[in-house]
Design a protein with these regions (language model features):
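Glycine-rich, often acidic-flanked micro-motifs
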Residues: 1-139
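Acidic, low-complexity/disordered tracts enriched in E/D and polar residues
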Residues: 111-176, 206, 219-222
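Long, charge-rich, low-complexity alpha-helical segments
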Residues: 163-222
């Protein structure tokens, strides 16, 4: 048997008609929902994804998306062109018709998002700091240099060079609080304003800041 060669071809090269040129019942076709499909060993299941989850899943399947201008913004725009996004886990694609029908009968609006532009530098590296345990009341923290970021549905995806980091909960709130230098008290106030009061909120913020410093996503202002 002759070996096969894998190649990349544009739809037009394969004779595939662009959807913008197709109609149904006299109306132009449009994309109704956006799915990220994954083959599994058993069963067919459709689940909603947050935009941040969809971004990280999509990024894992690419090798050079970070070379795009504003890479996360470019992907977020693509992933919100239609309802969803959704995760389709399938073992038999031919048995997914009912799931697709449900999407058409109950369309979902795409999520909103906020773009937080970074430096655009794809050569950045995550550099951890161990200063969290010795922070004083007057010490101030700010976001470490990053390439691009997207905030949506209480989650933030931060791209540092070629590495995406998904933050949620207090992590997302604390990172979002630091476009300019903030003390721990100011970060705590912003996290509580975003997520609500909690009897252990100070401990939670302290631990979160330590984690963000160790991950290289926040840095202490010298």
């Amino acid at each position: 048997q002759e070996p096969t060669v894998k190649g990349d071809h544009a739809p037009a090269e394969l004779g595939i008609t662009p959807a913008t040129e197709l109609t149904f019942a006299g109306e132009p076709l449009r994309m109704a929902a956006l799915l990220i499909a994954e083959r599994v060993s058993q069963g067919n299941k459709l689940e909603p994804l947050t935009l941040a989850e969809a971004l990280t899943k999509f990024i894992a399947q690419t090798s050079s998306f970070y070379l795009l201008p504003n890479p996360l913004l470019t992907l977020a725009r693509a992933l919100t062109l239609a309802g969803g996004p959704w995760q389709l886990n399938f073992s038999y694609q031919a048995q997914c018709a009912d799931l697709f029908k449900q999407l058409l009968e109950h369309p979902a609006d795409p999520p909103s998002y906020q773009h937080i532009p970074g430096s655009g530098d794809v050569n950045l590296k995550l550099t951890s700091s161990s200063m969290g345990t010795s922070l004083g009341d007057s010490d101030r923290l700010v976001r470490a240099p990053y390439t691009d970021a997207i905030y949506s549905e209480w989650q933030t995806v931060v791209l540092v060079g070629t590495v995406p980091v998904l933050l949620d909960g207090a992590g997302a709130a604390a990172w979002m609080a630091c476009p300019i230098p903030h003390t721990l008290a100011e970060i705590h106030a912003d996290v509580v304003a975003a997520l609500g009061e909690h009897r252990k909120s100070w401990n939670l913020v302290d631990e979160t800041v330590d984690t963000l410093l160790a991950a290289g996503l926040l840095q202490v202002v010298e």
